[in-house]
Amino acid sequence: SGYSGAALDFPVAPSLAGHYSLTNCGQPSGASKCAEGTVPQAAFEKGTCYRELYASSCHHEETQIFQYPAV
């Protein structure tokens, strides 16, 4: 749905989650980094998440590793 193209390999905007396009199908991708912030009047965790995408026959798998700062 308009999310194809080499320039859009790793969009980090939350609205683009699940709309990744990998140029080399069947090969592991790099990891993209996104910032998790807070929303006013909502209790969201603060932290840094790292998204790793893997393509297998153009099927995308996404794993997210969250790292929170020490209190």
Swiss-Prot record:
It is a peripheral membrane protein. Phycourobilin 3 binds at C58. Its main location: plastid. (2R,3E)-phycoerythrobilin binds at C49. It comes from the Eukaryota. One of its GO terms (cellular component) is chloroplast thylakoid membrane. Phycourobilin 1 binds at C25. It is found in: Plastid, Chloroplast thylakoid membrane. Keywords: Antenna complex, Bile pigment, Chloroplast, Chromophore, Electron transport, Membrane, Photosynthesis, Phycobilisome, Plastid, Thylakoid, Transport. Contains four covalently linked bilin chromophores. Phycourobilin 2 binds at C34. One of its GO terms (biological process) is photosynthesis. Critical for the incorporation of phycoerythrin in the phycobilisome complex. Heteromer of 6 alpha, 6 beta and 1 gamma chains. This is R-phycoerythrin gamma-1 chain, chloroplastic. It comes from Gastroclonium coulteri.
